[in-house]
Amino acid sequence: MTIGSFFSSLLFWRNSQDQEAQRGRMQEIDLSVHTIKSHGGRVASKHKHDWIILVILIAIEIGLNLISPFYRYVGKDMMTDLKYPFKDNTVPIWSVPVYAVLLPIIVFVCFYLKRTCVYDLHHSILGLLFAVLITGVITDSIKVATGRPRPNFYWRCFPDGKELYDALGGVVCHGKAAEVKEGHKSFPSGHTSWSFAGLTFLSLYLSGKIKAFNNEGHVAKLCLVIFPLLAACLVGISRVDDYWHHWQDVFAGALIGTLVAAFCYRQFYPNPYHEEGWGPYAYFKAAQERGVPVTSSQNGDALRAMSLQMDSTSLENMESGTSTAPR
């Protein structure tokens, strides 16, 4: 064995040890930093003020649903456009939190079980709840302030079809108080705004996780991202078909939900088309503080393949007695 081959072997052994140490540090971080057991409480405690604000938003949302809306003047001439049938909801109100909140959380948990990143799980749930609750508060605040009558207001006001008006030509309703109250909450659509808030957040989350915009031309990924948005659109259409909302109500609700969801998502995650769009900001910050380079799973596989290839080349050079050291 030549002196050059000896030093090449020594250098290769040293590099191998450094690589093993680096892998060990990365594995240690993956196992100890990103789990609920080790850092779940710490992450939640760091965002305790956010959770307090969420509780306040819930209280505001409950209060907005208890107070009476503005009883806008409704005259006899206006009743022609408000005489649509009083139908049941195609999408029941109880189902909205199920598909707009519970379903996305189930998806978040599935990704957590695969990657065990507590930052991702915590921030996705927190961002989703902020999206739907802020949307709900905005929607119901506008509902209460505007008091726009629903398309089926006539049958809420006059369930027996017997019309009654005051001296100014305004309606004097004799229907159930709760139905008349609900009849003044047309603008904007709550079903639609909640649907777009929760499902737009889910769509953005999925697009980042599956790298839907990585310029590789996988249309199947795009279909998966579009599906939640399509579901939200169908909910909005059902509100018009059921004569519970005017089309303007649905459009406004969709706009509110989409914008709020996008803003809330970007508070915790990079753009889905970004190289680091697959993870939350906090994940990369934690890794950076520990001096560990973080890549996506795909990039990690590529780096490992390159490392194995370099190791294989070095071994071949050693066996052939060829030095790789600079001459």
From Swiss-Prot:
Belongs to the PA-phosphatase related phosphoesterase family. GO terms for biological process: cellular response to hypoxia; phospholipid metabolic process; plant-type hypersensitive response; response to UV-B. This is Lipid phosphate phosphatase 1. It is an enzyme of class 3 (hydrolase). PA phosphatase activity inhibited by N-ethylmaleimide with an IC(50) value of 10 mM. Its EC number is 3.1.3.-. The gene is LPP1. Plays a general role in cellular responses to stress, may be by attenuating the signal produced by phospholipases. Exhibits both diacylglycerol pyrophosphate (DGPP) phosphatase and phosphatidate (PA) phosphatase activities. Substrate preference is diacylglycerol pyrophosphate > phosphatidate. GO terms for molecular function: phosphatidate phosphatase activity.
